[in-house]
Amino acid sequence: LLTDITYLSYKNGKKAYLSTIKDSSTNEILAHYVSDNLRLDIVLNTLEKLKSNVNLKLHSEAILHSDQGVHYTSPKFQKQVQQLGLKQSMSRRGNCWDNAPQESFFGHFKDEVILSKCSTLEEVIKEIDDYMDYYNNYRYQWNLSKMTPVQYRNHLVS
């Protein structure tokens, strides 16, 4: 599993932040959370959404990989990761290539989602929720044998 946070700009220069957890095997976004700030809660809430994902059965040796940002080195975050039964891995300091698939997702996301028309954080959240549904269930990917992430997951477990 991969996790990271990206900043988002919307109408009149307002900022929002998106935290995601991505399955690196299927490219499925398993959990995401949007906030208007970068407090620790953004990653803790993302972990809570991962925990409540009813379609998910985590492997006993699953690893959650991130950069070495302050959120991911926080003892509170690390404890919550451990409580989920995950092992934690972090990129080498200052090396974005270690989390390249997650960074790539954010790049595609920013190319495909137009948030400049959103006036409120609630509108941003709705756009992002709609995109995550589209990305996981309708957006075919060449590297997944031309399947969507959910189709590919189902293919792997069948």
Which positions does each model-derived feature cover?
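C-terminal domain-tail junction helix/linker
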Residues: 75, 79-86, 110-158
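Acidic/histidine-rich, metal-coordinating catalytic segments
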Residues: 57-73, 92, 147-148
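Catalytic cores and conserved motifs of cyclic dinucleotide signaling enzymes
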Residues: 13-14, 73-75
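RNase H-like polynucleotidyl transferase catalytic core
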Residues: 63-68, 82-100, 117-119
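Short amphipathic alpha-helical "interface-anchor" segments enriched in bulky aromatics
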Residues: 101-110
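Active-site beta-loop-alpha junctions of metal-dependent nucleic acid enzymes
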Residues: 14, 32-57
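An active-site-proximal beta-strand-loop segment
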Residues: 2-30, 36
